[in-house]
Amino acid sequence: MGDNQILVPLKIDLHISSDALDSYLLDLIHAAEEYITTEGITLDPNNFGDRLLVEMYAAHLYRSRRDTGDKSKMPRMLRWALNNRLFSQKISEG
């Protein structure tokens, strides 16, 4: 996927203006892509929704790295987005 197309909105979402964490954030983006594909979702790098899904997942990984308990759980919005994306893919595959 276009890493910069995901990195810029991720940094905005996380309120990060410095480039100091770019390498770490790119690692989170790649991890998010891998985690999403293990759920059976085929990501399309040209699909804005898929890029946003990766960004949301990477933001969750960043935020949950220091949280414990309920705060480290995946947000419902993200779980629903993943489920909706997978169901949409399965329907289009027939």
For each feature predicted by the language model, list its residue ranges.
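Conserved short "hinge" loops at termini or chain/domain junctions
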Residues: 1-53, 85-94
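Protruding loop/beta-arch "assembly-hinge" segments enriched in small, turn-prone residues
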Residues: 68-94
